[in-house]
Amino acid sequence: MTKAITLAIFMVVLVLGMVTKETQGEEKQCYDYLLTPQENCEGLICAHECTMQHGGNGVCVDTTSTVCICTYDCTS
């Protein structure tokens, strides 16, 4: 009886975890390319500009490039 209850609880937790994962992935991601004013892209400046403009996460493409890729949740 204890094994059956433990198995049932485990299955409920597993199913709820899968449902939660599916609903979180429904948000559409948008991308924007930001040009940094410096000669080289700096990670902190890229992240700050992306957060201020879109509320997202900014990542430098390359340290020798001036391109910053901003990823954020689309509202529409």
Swiss-Prot record:
Extent of the signal sequence: 1-25
Keyword Disulfide bond carried by entry: yes
Entry's Gene Ontology BP terms: defense response to fungus; killing of cells of another organism
Pfam families named among the record's database cross-references: SLR1-BP
Organism domain of life: Eukaryota
PANTHER family in UniProt: DEFENSIN-LIKE PROTEIN 122-RELATED, DEFENSIN-LIKE PROTEIN 184-RELATED
Name recorded for this polypeptide: Defensin-like protein 125
Native species: Arabidopsis thaliana
